[in-house]
Amino acid sequence: MEDNRKKALGAALSQIERQFGKGAVMKMGDQPREAIPAVSTGSLGLDVALGIGGLPYGRIVEIYGPESSGKTTLTLQVIAEAQKQGKTCAFVDAEHALDPVYAEKLGVNVDELLVSQPDTGEQALEIADMLVRSNAVDVIIVDSVAALTPKAEIEGEMGDSHVGLQARLMSQALRKLTGNVKHANCLMVFINQIRMKIGVMFGSPETTTGGNALKFYSSVRLDIRRIGSVKDGDEVVGNETRVKVVKNKVSPPFRQAEFQIMYGKGIYHMAEVLDMGVKEGFVDKSGAWYAYNGDKIGQGKANACKFLEENLDIANEIEAKVRDKLMPKPVKKETAEAPAEANGELL
């Protein structure tokens, strides 16, 4: 009976391959287990919280939060990090609010960045889909879902009712995009805004725009919030920011990271390296003094960060140690099978 079942399965698989091409159905163990490729977010704490060292290529990601919480800044940092890897990036600016001067300050190579400012939501998503299908773009940012206005709404009158139009548009687009994004190994990030549900008595009244489709299709969802101000004397020079990983299909979810976003500079990376170095025991802190490998690197956090900025090799060394300690290492199938093969050869 078992032989008959195996023969039937073999016949079905060969027929599927003939009809749909090689690789249409395969055993999961046939492919080598590899770490999911990712691009850094520019924040060490967030890279660790995501579990794979950043945002995953070949997946859809949603970043949402209140106004002025750092959503666009975070995505521009992702573009800057991807460009350092030699990747091609595109920014679909549906809000028509991208500032090239600010983007350049965050490390984005604006000369190489593809930018589109579409008129309608349909046009924006069609452009994004064509870029994905070209297999030549590695990171696409859509800013934002709330600004993807359906054509019927733009051509209609101000008071016209267009219930559910945007949700239907997003649902249809994501059905097309999700497979293409995977095949092209492209990271697609949707920025989203928050709205309040009316009449909610229990639970959070907050919801994101564009219906529920994006919540399902996203492999990673990040909730970004401003939790305080960074001050230099009486002057506010930045935001204290908290990011929660509310959904994660590539690593355990519900972790969070806190970091500073400095005005005109972006994520304060050195402060994170220093804080996490102290937390993991790679940097010694005695009173106000910080020391690394027995050598004092500064009195007070500001001086220690300045030292790390001037000595990037030491900063990179501390960061590498933190990543090595906190990032999970994938178990390769080949290494697990190697001893058995060796024993077979000896026999």
Swiss-Prot record:
It is found in: Cytoplasm. GO terms for biological process: DNA recombination; DNA repair; SOS response. One of its GO terms (cellular component) is cytosol. One of its GO terms (molecular function) is ATP hydrolysis activity. Its main location: cytoplasm. Keywords: ATP-binding, Cytoplasm, DNA damage, DNA recombination, DNA repair, DNA-binding, Nucleotide-binding, SOS response. ATP binds at residues 65-72. CDD domains: RecA (cd00983). It holds the Pfam family RecA_C. It comes from the Bacteria. Belongs to the RecA family. Can catalyze the hydrolysis of ATP in the presence of single-stranded DNA, the ATP-dependent uptake of single-stranded DNA by duplex DNA, and the ATP-dependent hybridization of homologous single-stranded DNAs. It interacts with LexA causing its activation and leading to its autocatalytic cleavage. This is Protein RecA.
